[in-house]
Amino acid sequence: MIITRTPFRISFFGGGTDYPDWYNNNPGAVISTTINKYCYITCRPLPPFFDYKYRIRYHKKEETKNIQEIKHPSVRECLKYTKTIQGLEIVHHADLPARSGLGSSSTFTVGMLHALNALHGKMMSKRQLALDAIDIEQNIIKENVGSQDQTNAAFGGFNHIEFNKTKKIIVNPIILSKMKISKISSHLMLFFTGFSRTASDISKHQITAIKKNKIDMTHNYELVEEA
């Protein structure tokens, strides 16, 4: 049995400049950090005694005979991406609900990839996990997502992350003393409003507006460098 624990994130500066539509033509950067709230993925081989091959548990229950029947897009495409053909039971648990604005879908994808690769006996680098998750979400599932959530989930920690048209993601850890980290934490408050929303829908409007809001986007990038 493989269990992965992958952190959620909060973003401070640079949001929007991590979309490929922006950083393919302009420099992009964010300052963000992962937090002590996690997504847990449990993955184990399923004995061949059932009339289905894949048993998947999240807020829904799925039992399917083949990968193509799986409705959860990230589970389905991660299985294909890692060329996993054996029967599996996959169970998802999380400290926070989905669609809470903390990068939960990308955190799930990174954790799923990590679990499946571990099941195959492969230890992926943080960078490769991030790049694979970005590829799956942006190019295969066609989600309207940026590139910071996957990078944060894969690398963890407090980081200054740079994006550019070469597709090379540069992760610069922000090294702070325990005293400074404690001071920052003591000035942060995070609330759950009880409302949820689909990030892809919001991002779709943001991506459409990128060309129109170049001044604002450039300012977002400059704020990162100033911070």
Where would I find each of the regions flagged by the language model?
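C-terminal nucleotide
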Residues: M1-F13, D18-D21, V30-S32, N36-T84, ...
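Short glycine/proline-enriched turns and hinge-like loops at secondary-structure junctions
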Residues: Y23-N25, G103-S104, N144-V145
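Short, well-ordered coil loops that connect the C-terminus of an alpha-helix to the N-terminus
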Residues: T84-I85, K122
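Residues at or immediately flanking beta-strands
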Residues: G87-E89
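Short pre-catalytic strand/loop immediately N-terminal to key active-site residues, enriched for Gly-Thr
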Residues: L96-S100
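DPxDG-like acidic metal-binding loop motif
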Residues: L102-K126
